[in-house]
A protein has these predicted regions:
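Conserved catalytic core of the tyrosine transesterase superfamily
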Residues: 1-262
Length: 262
């Protein structure tokens, strides 16, 4: 195969991975999708520093030796931490796995990338919330408003389930089981892994008040618990908007009590 043919083929697969495959078959998390896009963008930037052009862009650009040079470049030229380098490498591996599934001639690239050792990371102590900080944060939403009711339930579920932002965003009505002896919610994680989180009576009461405000009548099992007002009940709330709102509420609670991580 000519190098130019190889270049066109790989470029087409990069676009297909970012625009079609990843958002439809890997994740709905905007953060993860952005991570894939950033990793591939940085890899292309690195290849340009290696004098790679359309004329010599080919499969050899994704071989182990080149990827290892990329990691060094990330550390030395981009000042990336070991943790960030590992995230970038993980994202590139996901693309190379996809590439190998599209054309068996590229499968060896993924197999080589799997052998690259991750960077050693220093374990960091995670700063948690104190009980007072949690109470202060849950007191921020104004429950006299619909938005306040939503924020309270969202924050409560985030805290009591220890779920990720996207797991809470992805809850549908059918994932809630509120009327049994032991009420629970099913959280759908990465690669569609299901995790069950049991709910206390007070949390169940919050959710039922929220349901009456946001899901009139008999809720559709396939509707999102937290949906976009613009997109409707079958469109989940955007991750950036929720993350920004959570930070603002945490900032407000920090003004009232110490113990909130910055």
């Amino acid at each position: 195969m000519k190098k130019t043919d190889d270049a066109v083929k790989i470029a087409r697969y990069i676009s297909e991975f970012l625009d079609v495959y990843a958002p439809n078959f890997l994740t709905t998390s905007e953060h993860t999708l952005k991570s894939y896009r950033n990793a591939l963008g940085l890899y292309i930037n690195f290849l340009e520093t290696e004098s790679v052009t359309l004329g010599n862009f080919a499969r050899h650009c994704f071989e182990r030796e080149k990827i290892e040079k990329w990691i060094v470049w990330l550390k030395e030229s981009r000042n990336c931490s070991p943790e960030t380098c590992n995230v970038r490498l993980g994202s590139l591996r996901v693309f190379l796995e996809f590439l190998g599934s599209k054309d068996i001639e590229y499968l060896y690239l993924y197999q080589e990338a799997q052998k690259i050792k991750r960077q050693k990371c220093t374990k960091k102590k995670v700063a948690g919330f104190t009980r007072d900080a949690v109470a202060a944060m849950l007191a921020v939403p104004d429950v006299s408003t619909k938005t306040g009711k939503r924020d309270l339930v969202f924050l409560t579920l985030l805290y009591v389930t220890a779920g990720r932002l996207d797991e809470i965003r992805s809850i549908k009505i059918r994932h809630l089981h509120l009327d049994g002896k032991k009420p629970y919610v099913n959280l759908i994680g990465k690669r569609d892994k299901i995790r069950t989180a049991y709910l206390l009576p007070k949390v169940v009461a919050y959710i039922k008040v929220y349901l009456s405000a946001f899901h009139d009548g008999t809720p559709d099992p396939d509707a999102y618990l937290f949906y976009s007002r613009a997109g409707g009940k079958y469109t989940k709330l955007s991750e950036p908007a929720l993350a920004k709102r959570d930070k603002n509420m945490c900032r407000s609670s920090t003004q009232k009590v110490s113990g909130c991580p910055p």
